[in-house]
A protein has these predicted regions:
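Oxidoreductase and adenylate-handling cofactor-binding alpha/beta cores
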Residues: 96-115, 154-158, 287-300
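Rossmann-like adenosine-cofactor binding region
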Residues: 36, 48-52, 167-261
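N-terminal glycine-/charge-rich "phosphate-binding" loop or analogous flexible N-terminal tail
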Residues: 1-39, 43, 157, 161, ...
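Glycine-rich NAD(P)-binding loop of Rossmann-like domains
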Residues: 113-148, 175
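Phosphate-coordination loops involved in phosphoryl transfer and adenosine-cofactor binding
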Residues: 59, 133-136, 208, 217
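Rossmann-like dinucleotide-binding domain for NAD(H)/NADP(H)
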Residues: 84-85, 217-316
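NAD(P)-binding Rossmann-fold cofactor-contacting core
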Residues: 155-173
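Phosphate/diphosphate ligand-binding glycine-rich loop within oxidoreductases
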Residues: 38-114, 129
Length: 316
């Protein structure tokens, strides 16, 4: 039996140490094919659809080294008896820290001021830096990472508003925020932070109409998924000055191609999808994904299986 790793950055020695006790061999291969393939380890750029079962009919599990899972046909694979497993909480601290860094950067004008000095300008500033304490942070989504962001932002004196269809007001309040409708959040926030998962319901959630509700001096920070925001509508808002700026850790195509329009947008900070990253979180992401696949191969319940496969049935 084989486990195929389609990400050439995956540390195979660690994957083998975790999975080979299950009686499998672990190999890097961009081709998923063979009756002996029982599991696949993938990454956000490695899409896995139901058609994989045409070439690997005995597939039991797909593990991704990411929290996001929009690259996996979760429901379709579950219907065919395949577990899809993601990793959770492996980079919560890193994403919170990076998002806070971007919030500080846009409000305090860190990148703008650096650019002025390099251009030979010292004073005056084209835009005044703003205080972080007392600013309104609007958080779109309420999960483990956004919970950490709310706690951290409220601790430094930000007024945190949260929009979520699923959150309870008491839970948001316990984290340090206030639950409000999305439209109210957009109209009030100094900074809107996108922190929700990408699903069919959230795809394009922040569209042209939503961006138009933002204050003209507001910033948008996205460390979640690019497709939650209408990319072209955001660009138009930045180019026309309808909002003050943006900080983006995610783009529609990654790595960014040379013709990526965001590269020329004014008042925009762009990051290489790095909010999740540290040496520690990198190791945890690979190990946790392999551990969950190992659980499936041992006949156990994975910790982070997203949809119970039909053929597995309910737990006893």
């Amino acid at each position: 039996m084989r486990v195929v790793v389609i990400d050439d950055t995956w540390p195979l020695d660690r994957a083998r140490a975790i999975l080979e006790p299950c009686g499998v061999t672990v190999e890097f291969n961009t081709e998923i094919a063979g009756d002996d393939v029982v599991a696949v380890l993938t990454y956000p750029g490695g899409k896995i659809g139901v058609d994989v079962l045409d070439a690997a009919p005995n597939l039991k599990a797909v593990g991704t080294c990411s929290t996001g899972f929009d690259h996996l046909a979760v429901d379709g694979l579950a219907e065919r008896g395949v577990w899809c497993c993601r990793v959770t909480h492996f980079c919560d601290v890193e994403v919170v820290d990076h998002t806070m860094a971007l919030i500080y950067a846009v409000l305090r004008g860190v990148v703008m001021l650096d650019g002025l000095v390099r251009e030979g300008t010292w004073w005056p500033y084209p835009r005044a830096p703003r205080p972080v304490r007392g600013s309104i942070l609007g958080v779109v989504g309420f999960g483990a990472i956004s919970h950490g962001l709310i706690t951290t932002a409220s601790a430094v004196g930000m007024d945190v508003r949260v929009a979520s269809e699923h959150a309870a007001a008491g839970d948001v309040a316990a984290a340090g925020g206030t639950l409000v409708p999305l439209d109210d959040l957009l109209g009030a926030a100094d900074v809107v932070a996108i922190m929700t998962s990408l699903t069919d319901r959230t795809r394009g959630l922040i569209d042209a109409a939503a961006i138009a509700k933002m204050r003209p001096d507001a910033y948008l920070v996205n460390t979640a998924r690019a497709a939650i925001v209408d990319h072209l509508a955001l660009g138009r808002a930045l180019e026309t000055g309808a909002i003050a700026g943006a900080a983006l850790d995610v783009l529609p195509v990654e790595p960014a191609p040379a013709d990526e329009p965001a590269l020329t947008w004014p008042n925009t900070i762009i990051q290489p999808h790095a909010a999740w990253y540290s040496a520690e979180s990198d190791r945890r992401s690979f190990d946790d994904a392999a551990e969950d696949v190992a659980r499936v191969l041992r006949g156990e319940e994975p910790l982070n299986g997203m949809t119970r496969p039909a053929e597995v049935g309910p737990l006893a």
